[in-house]
Regions:
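Small-residue-rich hydrophobic transmembrane alpha-helices
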Residues: 60-120, 157-176, 287-351, 382-404
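Hydrophobic transmembrane alpha-helices of multi-pass small-molecule transporters
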Residues: 72-75, 119, 187-192, 221-225, ...
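Helix-terminus/linker motif at the lipid-water interface of multi-pass membrane proteins
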Residues: 39, 43-61, 130-137, 193-204, ...
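Transmembrane helical elements of multi-pass membrane transporters/channels
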Residues: 29-48, 149, 160, 183, ...
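Structural signal for membrane-spanning alpha-helices in multi-pass inner-membrane proteins
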Residues: 122, 165, 191, 195, ...
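Short alpha-helical transmembrane segments in multi-pass integral membrane proteins
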Residues: 1-31, 88-155, 201-257, 313-378, ...
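Short runs within selected transmembrane alpha-helices of multi-pass transporters and secretion channels
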Residues: 81, 150-168, 176-184, 209-224, ...
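Residue-level signal for short hydrophobic patches within transmembrane helices
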Residues: 20, 24-43, 47, 69-76, ...
């Protein structure tokens, strides 16, 4: 891998924009490209599901059942990247170039290790995974074909995710956005070609959807590699004489592991919800899967906002600028709540229209319309919790994020859903989301009050 040493002045003698630019335009500058990138990322699964829904409802259900393990894969990639992002930004804020470089190099090494793990999972674990959720052999086989391709060829998604985090950590979110767009456009173009059998029956249906997805991911990965080696002078990456550093990896996962665990908790929640809903019907599972695809268009922009927010907070925390830290948090919460309000209005007032994108049958509409209207009530509270979760991570307190996530999804949402399912009405199950969000926001505010007192306030002295 080539280095960037020939480009511009080294980071030690330059002040990064995260320490000098006014907060509001800086947050928008970093976040808007990341928000677009995250929306584009949401397209990967959504586009697959839209085209697959026109094949059959069983194919849509299969892709929905695959989501839990896919989310684990994303969790590992993004969580590792979160650790790299926060530590790299903090190192640059402290003017510690050698630590910044070591963080980047070890992050890339970890992404390759993650690929190796999921390669093995793709070869060995597909059948037990799907048959644990359904006894329908048609749904299971369609899911196996889809998910095995995604896991075995997961090098693309892990490389792309890490590359994007390196760009975001140094303020180059526009380049991250471009790489996402390239991957998504390739996926969108290839999806109908493969899914509907234009390249042969062997690559049709769910198999074709997976092939189109991984090709798009590899294209995005190629772009991030190019941008980081040619257009990112804040880090100098060289694997000549590289040895994995247990200390650097430990620092990365001190921040990133709670993020991984939080998203894996989300996978356990979706897996559990699938089991609860399958007791009603496969159509209920398909509706839940469609909801998760659709809600990603509401939540992903906030995750993008957080990706822009985290390096600002980490950098200014390292530079001992508490005024900039607190202003960043306040602005991020305001923007997040605005996004959530827009999402609430769409789900509340146009559920039939959004469900129709997935070729929803009358049975799906009967379950899906009330589901969308009930579930979206928790959007009004979720914006604050999501932003504060990333604030905890940026300030090195990711364990608080993990505690909130585990309590919300495993100790409140799933038990509430199971109890409500005992009423015999699937419509009652959806209220579990609002109940869980009330608990989540109360815990998040309590933890933030503690962090403000012990971590942010001392920076004023």
């Amino acid at each position: 891998m080539k280095t960037n040493q020939s480009q511009t002045a080294p980071a030690e003698v330059r002040e990064n924009i995260m320490g000098t630019m006014e907060i509001n335009p800086l947050l928008l500058k970093l976040s808007i490209p990341m928000m677009i990138s995250m929306l584009v990322q949401a397209l990967y699964n959504v586009v697959d599901s839209v085209f697959v829904s026109h094949v059959s409802e069983s194919a849509l259900t299969a892709v929905s059942l695959a989501f839990s393990l896919q989310n684990v894969m994303i969790a590992v990639g993004v969580g590792t990247g979160v650790g790299v992002n926060a530590l790299l930004s903090k190192s640059l804020g402290e003017k510690n170039q050698s630590r910044a470089n070591a963080t980047a190099e070890n992050g890339i090494f970890l992404s390759l290790c993650s690929f190796a793990v999921f390669f093995v999972i793709g070869l060995t674990c597909m059948k037990p995974y799907f048959y644990a959720q359904t006894s329908d052999p048609v749904i299971a086989q369609q899911g196996i074909r889809y998910l095995s391709v995604c896991c075995i060829f997961s090098l693309g998604i892990f490389t792309q995710t890490m590359g994007e985090k390196l760009l975001a950590a140094t303020g180059r979110t526009q380049l991250s956005m471009i790489s996402q767009l390239v991957g998504a456009v390739v996926n969108i173009i290839l999806d109908p070609i493969f899914i509907f059998g234009y390249c042969g029956q062997a690559l049709s249906g769910t198999t074709g959807a997976a092939v189109a997805t991984v090709i798009g991911q590899f294209c995005g990965a190629g772009m991030t590699l190019y941008f980081n080696t040619r257009k990112n002078p804040d880090i100098q990456i060289s694997f000549k004489g590289f040895r994995p550093s247990a200390k650097a990896i430990g620092r990365i996962y001190t921040v990133g592991l709670p993020s991984i665990a939080m998203q894996c908790v989300g996978s356990l929640m979706t897996f559990g919800m699938n089991l609860i809903l399958m007791a009603f019907s496969a159509t209920a599972v398909a509706v839940f899967g469609v909801y998760f695809k659709l809600q990603s268009f509401v939540f992903m922009p906030i995750f993008g906002l957080n990706n822009g927010m985290v390096p600002i907070i980490s950098y200014n925390y390292g530079a001992r600028r508490p005024d900039r830290v607190k202003k960043t948090i306040k602005l991020a919460v305001c923007y997040a709540e605005g996004i959530m309000l827009a999402g609430f209005c769409i789900f509340q007032f146009a559920p039939r229209q959004v469900l129709s994108i997935f070729a929803a049958s009358d049975a799906m509409l009967a379950i899906g319309i009330p589901a969308m209207r009930i579930i979206c009530l928790h959007f009004l509270l979720a914006g604050v919790s999501i932003v504060l979760s990333s604030v905890f991570q940026a300030l090195g307190n990711g364990v608080f994020s993990l505690i909130v996530s585990v309590c919300r999804q495993l100790f409140v949402l799933l038990p509430a859903a199971w109890l409500l399912a005992q009423t015999g009405s699937v419509n009652n199950v959806w209220w579990a989301f609002f109940i869980a969000e009330v608990v989540s926001i109360l815990m998040s505010l309590a933890f933030y009050a503690r962090i403000n007192k012990t971590t942010i306030a001392p920076l004023y002295h």
